[in-house]
Curated annotation (Swiss-Prot):
Belongs to the D-glutamate cyclase family. NCBIfam families: PRK05463.1 (NF003969). GO terms for molecular function: lyase activity. Its EC number is 4.2.1.-. SUPFAM superfamilies: PSTPO5379-like. InterPro entries: D-Glu_cyclase, Putative_hydro-lyase, UPF0317. This is Putative hydro-lyase BRADO2538. Keywords: Lyase. Pfam families: D-Glu_cyclase.
Length: 272
């Protein structure tokens, strides 16, 4: 039985949404990738920073909506965002987190109970996992889901618009498709601007500063067939790279590929 099928069975038995059941599973230490988990529900990237930096970071997200589309934001010190889900706790409901100090990643805990502070503001940013459901519904193959690994992600030479101390390159995720499939993928994902929208680049990875497509900066490599082209979407790991470059004294993000699963429905994010 697949992880997704087992999750659905557990949710049905408990009378819960699959998204809620997934959060409960992660809360108890089950740390698998969230790709393909709780299909139909919106997944989000996390950026958790001290309140004193939150204004500049919020502005950064507004200036860079492709990689940083905000779908939720907490009050300072509040680990709950009710609009995103019932019984949702930012401190425990993600499979793995990253703790940053002065720009260095110092720990990858499975919960934040020992790290939580009253001044922390959580930003939840849209994730491309959400539009993957629409791609698969149209019959398009998603390579990293087929292979049971994390989506490959790369730093690029595409500069984000800076805000205060927040600046740096865009990070992109990659999915390979045959040319006709790539055209269809553009058409489908254009409908989902709240989760990165249309791709930012197709083919020739060197044009956006990617030297070796087989060596991603985050996630896992996937094969690209000789009859396929790589298609790149803006990625919510961008703020992770930007926060690290800003060398904040303290910050928290999710571990790449291990997202927050919300109770929002993917179909409700479509604009057409």
């Amino acid at each position: 039985m697949t992880v997704s099928a087992a999750l659905q069975q557990s949710a049905d038995e408990a009378g819960l949404l699959p998204s809620h059941q997934a959060r409960l599973d992660y809360r108890t230490g089950k740390g698998w990738s969230t790709a393909g988990v709780a299909n139909g529900f919106v997944q989000g990237n996390l950026a958790i920073i001290p309140e004193r930096y939150a204004g500049a970071f919020h502005r950064f997200c507004q200036l860079n909506p492709k990689p940083c589309p905000i779908i939720g934001m907490s009050d300072p010190g509040n680990p709950h965002i009710p609009a995103l889900g019932a019984d949702l706790d930012i401190r425990t409901d993600v499979p793995r987190y990253r703790v940053w100090r002065d720009g260095e990643m110092v720990e990858e805990p499975t919960d934040l109970l020992a790290h939580w502070r009253d001044d922390l503001v959580t930003f939840v940013l849209g994730c491309s996992f959400s539009f993957e459901e629409a791609l698969m519904a149209d019959g398009l193959p998603i390579r990293h889901i087929e292979q049971g690994c994390r989506v490959p992600m790369y730093r690029t030479n595409i500069a984000c618009t800076p805000s205060g101390q927040f600046a740096g390159p865009m990070v992109v995720s990659m999915r390979p498709f045959k040319p006709a499939q790539a055209i269809r993928a553009v058409q489908i994902t254009t409908r989902f601007p709240a989760v990165h929208g249309a791709p930012v680049h197709l083919g020739l990875p060197e044009q956006i500063g990617i030297a070796d497509i087989n060596t991603p900066d985050y996630g896992d490599p996937v094969p690209v067939g000789t009859d396929e082209i790589p298609v790149f979407w803006a990625c919510g790991v961008t703020p992770q790279a930007v926060i690290a470059a800003a060398k904040l004294p303290f910050a928290i993000t999710h571990a790449p590929g291990l997202m927050l699963i919300t109770d929002l429905r993917n179909k409700d994010l479509a604009v057409l």
